[in-house]
Amino acid sequence: KKMQAAGNDILNLGIGSPDIAAPKLVIDTLKETASHKEASQYQPYNGIAALRIGFSDWYRRVFDVTLDYETEILPLLGSKEAVMHIHLAFCNPGDTILVPNPGYPAYAASAKLLGLTIVYYDLEESNNWMASIDQLQQKVTRNCKILWVNYPNMPTGAVVGKKELSDLVNFAKHNNLLLVNDNPYSMVLN
């Protein structure tokens, strides 16, 4: 922000915020649907079953993962809500989370609201933008609860391989961490 204020042209790679309007068909459908009396009623907290079944089917087809739509899928309003829910479920004030730099600002923003300690680990070009297990080992603490990763990564575009992902899983298991791969760009960058 200081560099922008000084007149430097800065490209913000922090959040993928769309700057185009939704397609006309989507807008027209939303307008039409909003006129239904059911549209203003409260929806089930866990979403409608048809949506959760659809998500479960998609995960099976795309990732070869079986999810129970009744107990393992919770549709949310967006990633910020999901990040907050994960922090609320797995952390207490004073706990530590490991966050990539560069990375999604919502990880730290949510953590700050909840009184968590944020420890950043660097994603470096010399390591193909992958999390370094050696660096993570130096940063992990006794009260560390979550390791956030983001692959395919934004803003770097790095795609994690099976070996690197296996290394991250083993590191998380060894250190009793919840490993969260925030994966919003899986269908765009893979």
Task: Label each residue range with its predicted role.
Residues 89-111:
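Conserved PLP-anchoring active-site segment centered on the Schiff-base-forming lysine
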